[in-house]
């Protein structure tokens, strides 16, 4: 994959007010499934662990839910937004942290993802791209992370140069856990050079 050295992700804009949502970094995965609970034994105690069970998602993906929200909804179908992570093969992985509950009118779009980040690499041969999502000043994210995504060749060829800000959206292939980009557009980011 081609790549360029990105600016320091720990830099924050000096002398600026709160960030507009249109320039923040973010990544969100929308899923609809059943609220479930399993028991976790830790230091002799049994703790409930609430999660969203989504049919067809890889077994290696765990969609955590907040106990206060999930406990009264055990067994119900709900939609939720999580912070996605992928491995180097562009497959969803690991323990995904919840962001927020989805209103029912948004459920029909799931499984769906969207993000705003900095294009880190493009591999035309493999049909993949990488996007870096960085912490926003005053945000909860403490360290940048990179998502590896699949995309059609025509979309990859149309992307701007590595280092550019992009907004991407696409779908989750449930059986394989792949995130496939279907649409992109240029995006301004808070740490863009002036």
What are these model-predicted stretches?
Residues 2-4:
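Short, compositionally biased pre-sequence/patch detector
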Residues 6-46, 108-127:
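Structural detector for short beta-strands of small beta-barrel domains
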Residues 31-35, 74-84, 117-119, 163-172:
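OB-fold and OB-like beta-barrel modules that bind single-stranded nucleic acids
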Residues 46-104:
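Acidic (E/D-rich), amphipathic helical modules within compact regulatory domains
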Residues 47-72, 135-164:
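Beta-strand/loop nucleic-acid-binding surfaces
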Residues 83-112, 171-194:
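OB-fold/S1-family single-stranded nucleic acid-binding modules
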Residues 95-150:
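Extended, positively charged loop/linker patches that create polyanion-binding surfaces
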Residues 132-149, 161-193:
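C-terminal interaction module
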């Amino acid at each position: 994959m081609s790549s360029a050295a990105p600016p320091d992700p720990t830099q924050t804009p000096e002398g600026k007010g709160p960030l507009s949502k249109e320039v923040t970094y973010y990544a969100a995965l929308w899923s609809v499934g059943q609220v479930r609970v399993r028991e976790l034994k830790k230091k002799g105690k049994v703790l409930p662990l609430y999660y969203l069970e989504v049919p067809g998602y890889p077994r290696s993906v765990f969609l955590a839910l907040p106990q206060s929200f999930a406990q009264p909804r055990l067994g119900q179908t709900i939609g939720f937004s999580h912070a996605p992570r992928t491995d180097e093969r562009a497959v969803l992985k690991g323990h995904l942290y919840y962001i927020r509950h989805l209103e029912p009118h948004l459920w029909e779009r799931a499984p769906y993802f969207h993000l705003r980040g900095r294009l880190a690499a493009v591999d035309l041969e493999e049909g993949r791209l990488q996007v870096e999502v960085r912490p926003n000043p005053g945000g909860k994210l403490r360290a940048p992370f990179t998502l590896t995504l699949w995309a059609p060749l025509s979309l990859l060829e149309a992307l701007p140069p590595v280092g550019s800000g992009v907004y991407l959206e696409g779908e989750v292939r449930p059986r394989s856990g792949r995130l496939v980009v279907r649409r992109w557009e240029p995006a301004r980011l808070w740490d863009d050079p002036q």
